[in-house]
A protein has these predicted regions:
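Hydrophobic small-molecule pocket/channel-lining residues, especially in calycin-type beta-barrels
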Residues: 1-170
Length: 170
């Protein structure tokens, strides 16, 4: 399979550190994260590839994110709001996944932050740039307490899933 040609979001994606805004600084600042933690996050993302493996089928959206600072797997039913208890404490995160088809997904989340509550919209969609397929991520965060918003646009290049799994083992 040629991993550079995609018609849907399914498969492995590696953050393109040379296109868009790969840094999460503005997002993290809006969330109220400390400067020290932001610098550590940026260092981690510079040293280790950020990989997303996406699977959309049977009305479900599954994503496995791996990076120096984030290793998680989530699965949601498309069109159904999901509440998740966060530890420690009894705070909740609410997530709603919507999709207009296999080449686009929008994950809307309301979650607690360092200084209150945030609304996040994470839109992933296929785009064609210079005859190459990329996954464009438009990540919008709004801090409900400060009313501050920030939009980050990141691009991912397609990789074979086996490549993504090899990266995790190294």
């Amino acid at each position: 399979m040629n991993s550079n040609v995609r018609e849907n979001l399914n498969g492995g994606w590696k953050l393109d550190k040379n296109r868009g805004e790969p840094s999460m600084r503005g997002y993290l600042e809006t969330m109220g994260v400390s400067e020290l933690a932001i610098v550590a996050h940026e260092k981690g993302e510079a040293e280790v590839d950020t990989i997303n493996v996406i699977q959309m089928r049977d009305g479900k959206y599954k994503i496995k994110k791996t990076s120096r600072v984030n290793n998680m797997e989530e699965e949601f039913e498309i069109g159904k709001e999901t509440k998740t208890k966060l530890t420690p404490g009894d705070k909740e995160k609410m997530t709603l996944v919507q999709s207009e088809g296999p080449a686009q997904v929008c994950v809307k989340t309301i979650m607690p932050t360092m200084n209150g509550l945030a609304e996040v919209s994470d839109i992933k969609e296929l785009v064609n740039i210079d005859n190459s397929t990329f996954m464009k991520q438009s990540l919008t965060i709004t801090n409900k307490d400060t009313n501050r918003s920030y939009v980050t646009e990141r691009f991912y290049i397609p990789i074979d899933v086996i490549d993504a799994e090899d990266k995790e083992d190294s």
